[in-house]
Amino acid sequence: MQRGALRGASPTARRRLVDRPGLTEDEIEEIREAFNLFDTDGSGMIDPKELKAAMQSLGFETKNPTIYQMIADLDRDSGGPIDFEEFLDAITAKLGDKESREGIQKIFSLFDDDRTGTITLKNLKRVAKELGETMSEDELREMLERADSNGDGEISFEDFYAIMTKKTFP
C-alpha cells in the first residue's frame, strides 16, 4: 500500500478526512491501508463481511450484529456497502467511545480537585506546582483562555474533552 494516499485528494476532501479528533494523518493512512486491504474486489466499498475482517484486523472485537448496525448507521448512500469516509467515521466513533471518555473524565477529576465541575486558574496552578512545572500566571491564564470555549474563565469537562481529543491546539 502507498503511504500518502491522501496527498492526491482535493483540499476539501483532505480536510474532511484528516480533521478527525484523536487521529493523526499517519493513523488515517493506516486505516486507509486496512480499508484497501479488505476491499477485496477493489470497488472502493466494503461489504459487511469485508468490514468485519477489517475491524478485527484493527483490533476491534465485534460481532456480526454490531457490524451490520454500524453499516446501517454509517451508510448514508443506499444501505449497502460503505466507502472509506464512512469506514473512517466508524473507526473514529470506536476510538471516541465511552471508555476513552471515561478515561478523560478521570484525568479531568485530577485537575478538578475541588469538585466544582470546572478547571480554574487555581486548579492549573496546583497541578503545575505538583508536576514541578514553573509556569507564570500569564502562561497558565493563556492555557486556560485557549481551552475555555465560552469565555467564563473556567474549563468545563466538554472543553477539556475537546482539547484532549484534538491533535493540534489553537
Swiss-Prot record:
Domain of life: Eukaryota
Positions annotated to bind Ca(2+): 39, 41, 43, 45, 50
Pfam families recorded: EF-hand_7
Assembly and interaction partners: Monomer. Does not homooligomerize.
Any single GO CC term annotated in Swiss-Prot or TrEMBL for this entry: cytoplasm
SUPFAM superfamilies: EF-hand
Region spans: Disordered: 1-21
Recorded GO MF terms: calcium ion binding
Primary location recorded for the protein, binned into one broad class: cytoplasm
Residue ranges of domain EF-hand in the record: 26-61, 62-97, 99-134, 135-170
The name this protein goes by in its record: Centrin-2
Function as written in the Swiss-Prot or TrEMBL entry: In tachyzoites, plays an essential role in microneme secretion that ensures parasite motility and attachment to, invasion of and egress from host cells. Also involved in the architecture of the peripheral annuli where it appears to regulate the localization of PAP2. In association with the myosin motor MyoJ, involved in the constriction of the basal complex at the end of daughter cell division in an actin-dependent manner; the basal complex is a cytoskeletal structure formed at the tachyzoite basal pole during daughter cell formation. May be involved in parasite replication.
Note on domains (UniProt): EF-hand 1 domain binds Ca(2+) with low affinity. EF-hand 2, EF-hand 3 and EF-hand 4 domains do not bind Ca(2+).
Swiss-Prot/TrEMBL keywords: Calcium, Cytoplasm, Cytoskeleton, Metal-binding, Repeat
Listed InterPro entries: CALM/Myosin/TropC-like, EF-hand-dom_pair, EF_Hand_1_Ca_BS, EF_hand_dom
One record GO biological process: positive regulation of regulated secretory pathway
UniProt family annotation: Belongs to the centrin family.
Localization terms from the record: Cytoplasm, Cytoskeleton, Microtubule organizing center, Centrosome
